[in-house]
UniProtKB/Swiss-Prot annotation:
One of its GO terms (cellular component) is P granule. This is Protein meg-2. The keyword Ribosomal protein does not apply. Residues 232-241, 427-442 have a biased composition (Low complexity). Keywords: Developmental protein. The lineage of its organism: Eukaryota, Metazoa, Ecdysozoa, Nematoda, Chromadorea.
Length: 819
């Protein structure tokens, strides 16, 4: 561990009362060790008149488990007024210290740290050196020969007052022959007069700048050089060394020695508590066991956070930095003594496994734990402390109930009865908001979250009221589920901006139901995120916003408004990915649902027709499935349009479509309508096979409908008007040129019944024979409805030549001629 810069008297000391200079000197003495020094612990040591001022700096441990080597750097006074050993000896030293205080302050006022001569003392091969003038005031290379400790651990400037504790087995108490250490004196073991004379002989005449190279001193003496200008006799120094010392502090702490077979040693220094950056459980919140010594009857463990702001008084000293050694049973132990944290981990792991909780995935945390903490295993004598790592949200320092660590939210509960159904699943997956509510208590309130937060999480701030009884857990993340009772006002969705609605493909829906629960829900986003909303009868009917046509086209949706005269509505809108649905519970106050007038190109592109079926009673069974998955549009329809239908074919008629007789008729008619176009162009069928026309089902049905009409007229003996029938057929075939039929072969267009009104004919057999001749005739120009698209049509055959077929999808987009 690196050494600390010692707090020496090498700097210029201001006269008593000059606090500004005192503070500047303190900063100079401390150096760059700002991170380890607290401003509240820095005190002035300007003179003896400031007996209550002290400078105590302990730099030890510093985040390492090895306490074998450290420096105690201190200077000045220490408050030992409560120590009974001090009071008996304080009066004897107060007078002598006071008499010399003024002289010390003035003699040391004009000194410069760079003028100090080098000094060196040794004790059993251990060297203590100070700065040398030849090195520009820098610390020379140290020659510390400490058993079991590397030299590099003692690197640093030790020209100031410092104490090295090389051996924890043998503790000695060293003296300081310095009158400026004006603390309340304490009865300590003092050096003999002989040792003091050796100190004098070693340093020579300090005031003259001479240094003795005597290295035979057996006691490690660290001389404060602020007294170097004083010429004192040996008896004077001996008298001072007995009475005017800075106290030596003891530390009581358990640590592991890494360099000596990891054997445990006991170090005891009485004074302040342990540092606050010591291997510690910084994310703790309960009352901690004491590791620091007691100060004025109070022990303050600085590593553990105390949410209750209470000092643990009289608690036992429980070590928390043992290095574990696992045994066969899985409980880490050190010399047969389990660590508190390891014992707690083991116990909680056993209980979590017994309750089928997930195993903890954190070294010292239990993200899935929420159960009662295990007993303290007898390690705490008073059994008053909670786990040091547990959060204590109710500010009770001695709460033994295990609280969730910071990985989870700590939600306090009250008035819980029955099964405990509260669950919070934080993260990804099945995060849910489940709220069981009654009408007996005040409503929980969500905080007023900012709009950008709501936008980022795609959630709406939904206030609730009159919630109590069952636990209402709200899990933040993806997914809200809220069940409301009828005792409070209905929840309101906020007025989300239009851009938000557009981005998520949802509309701001408000629903109302006169009685009973509502089944309306809004599911948007990914997965099973839903907004079930309980509605009252105080709000208007839900309305979908007027979304632009481009949005509807992109999502394959239509703006649907539904209503039902009785019972709930079964209309739903499913869009996006998966089973996301829009379900709306409707009342009888709204008009019937209507399909919008979608563009014909949209219908053709999706392979669906705008279908409306007439059903005077019962739900509608018409559905539209498009896109991916099970996205459906069940639509309640009215009877405002006639329903398109295919000809009703019996089995014999369907078989007739594949007969040679119908093929001959269809081929002849087809060739007359589309001359030069082979319907079997790329069919690959051989001549040996029956050359069945590769007409679409719709075209074959249309041709058959015409055929059946002709046959029926023949059997009736009706007078068929060939010209009118061909004109009607021409109009039907021209419809195949339209963009609607060419885009997808929609049944809405192609399945139109060829209502060829044929009047009168004596011989029906002549109809088919004369069909090709009649098709070649010129028909009168049909100007109405054609002027806007065609300037001139000299030959109606152009329309027939451009009629659509399965292999002529790129024909012109002409509208059907009006007759």
């Amino acid at each position: 561990m690196e050494n600390c810069d010692d707090l020496s008297s090498d700097e210029n000391l201001p006269p008593p009362g000059d606090h500004r200079r005192e503070q500047s000197q303190e900063r100079a003495r401390v150096g760059n060790r700002d991170e380890s020094v607290s401003s509240t612990n820095m005190r002035s040591i300007g003179g003896a008149v400031h007996n209550q001022q002290q400078l105590y700096w302990t730099d030890m441990y510093n985040g390492s488990n090895n306490l074998e080597n450290f420096w105690l750097c201190f200077s000045g006074n220490t408050s030992l007024a409560d120590d009974p050993t001090v009071q008996s000896d304080s009066s004897a030293s107060t007078q002598s210290r006071t008499n010399q205080s003024g002289t010390i302050a003035q003699e040391t006022d004009n000194r410069n740290a760079s003028n100090f001569p080098p000094r060196s003392t040794t004790r059993r091969g251990q060297t203590y050196e100070s700065r040398d003038e030849s090195q520009g005031g820098q610390a020379p290379s140290h020659q510390n020969q400490v058993p079991g400790v590397d030299r590099d651990e003692y690197a640093g400037d030790r020209s100031n007052v410092s104490i090295n504790l090389p051996s924890v087995d043998q503790w000695r108490e060293y003296s300081f022959s310095d009158n400026s250490f004006q603390g309340e004196s304490r009865t300590v073991q003092r050096r003999s007069s002989r040792a003091t004379h050796r100190v004098k002989n070693q340093f020579g005449s300090i005031g003259d700048g001479r240094t003795s190279n005597n290295t035979s001193l057996q006691e490690p003496v660290i001389q404060d050089t602020r007294n170097r200008n004083r010429s004192e006799s040996s008896s004077t120094m001996s008298s001072q060394s007995r009475t005017e010392h800075a106290p030596i502090f003891r530390l009581q702490y358990n640590y592991q020695r890494e360099a000596d077979n990891r054997s445990s040693r006991l170090v005891q220094i009485q004074g302040h508590s342990a540092p606050n950056n010591a291997n510690g459980l910084q994310n703790t919140g309960g009352q901690a066991p004491d590791i620091g010594p007691e100060v004025n009857g109070q022990s303050s463990d600085t590593r553990a956070m105390n949410m209750g702001n209470q000092m643990a008084q009289g608690d036992s000293h429980v070590p928390m930095n043992f290095v574990p050694r696992p045994l066969s049973n899985g409980v880490p132990r050190l010399h047969g003594v389990p660590r508190l944290v390891d014992m707690y981990d083991y116990e909680l792991a056993q209980r979590a496994h017994a309750r089928r909780y997930p195993t903890s995935n954190m070294p010292y945390g239990f993200p899935n734990a929420g159960f009662q903490a295990p007993p303290h295993m007898g390690l705490w004598p008073n059994n008053q402390n909670a786990d040091t790592r547990a959060m204590n949200m109710d500010n009770r320092s001695r709460d033994r109930t295990f609280q969730m660590p910071p990985a989870n939210a700590q939600v306090p509960t009250s008035s819980l009865s029955g099964l405990f159904n509260s669950s919070i699943n934080h993260g990804s997956g099945n995060q849910q908001f489940q709220m069981g509510q009654s009408s007996s208590g005040s409503a929980p309130q969500l905080p007023a979250l900012p709009e950008n937060f709501l936008m980022a999480h795609a959630n709406s701030q939904i206030p609730t009221s009159s919630l109590s009884g069952l636990f209402n857990a709200m899990n933040h993340g993806s997914g809200n589920r809220m069940n409301h009772s009828s005792s409070g006002p209905a929840p309101q969705l906020p007025n989300l901006p239009e851009s938000f609605l557009m981005a998520h493909g949802i509309g701001q829906v408000e629903t109302r139901s006169p009685a009973g629960p509502s089944n309306s829900s809004i599911n948007h986003g990914s997965g099973n995120q839903q907004f079930p909303v309980q509605q009252s009868s105080s709000r208007p009917a839900p309305q979908l916003p007027n979304l632009p046509e481009s949005f509807l086209m992109a999502h394959g949706l239509s703006q649907i408004q539904t209503s039902s005269t009785a019972g709930p509505s079964n209309s739903s809108m499913n869009h996006g990915s998966g089973n996301q649905q829009f379900r709306m519970g409707q009342s009888s106050s709204r008009p019937a649902p209507q399909l919008p007038s979608l563009q014909e190109s949209f219908l053709m592109a999706h392979g669906i027709a705008q279908v409306e079926t007439s059903s005077t009673a019962g739900p509608s069974n018409s559905s539209m499935n498009h896109g991916s998955g099970n996205q459906q549009f069940p639509v309640q329809q009215s009877s405002s349009r006639p329903a398109p239908h295919l000809p009703d074919l019996i089995r014999q008629e369907e078989e007739f479509l594949n007969t040679l007789e119908f093929e001959q008729f269809a081929r002849r008619l087809y060739n007359d309508l589309l001359p030069g176009v082979d319907p079997n162009y790329d069919s690959g069928t051989s001549t040996s096979e029956t050359p069945v026309l590769k007409f679409s089902i719709t075209l074959k049905a249309m041709l058959y409908d015409y055929w059946r009409t002709m046959v029926q007229m023949q059997y009736r003996g009706a007078n068929i008007n060939f010209l009118q029938s061909i004109i009607n057929l021409n109009a039907r075939s021209a419809a195949l040129n339209s963009s609607n039929a060419r885009a997808s072969g929609s049944a809405d267009v192609q399945n139109q019944t060829v209502s060829a009104t044929v009047e009168g004919a004596d011989d029906a057999s002549a109809n088919v024979n004369a069909l090709s001749d009649l098709l070649a005739q010129s028909f009168p120009r049909q100007a109405e409805g054609e002027a806007s698209r065609r300037n001139d049509i000299d030959h109606p055959e152009d329309d027939l030549n451009q009629a659509d077929s399965p292999k002529s999808d790129n024909q012109s987009d002409k509208d059907p001629p009006s007759n």
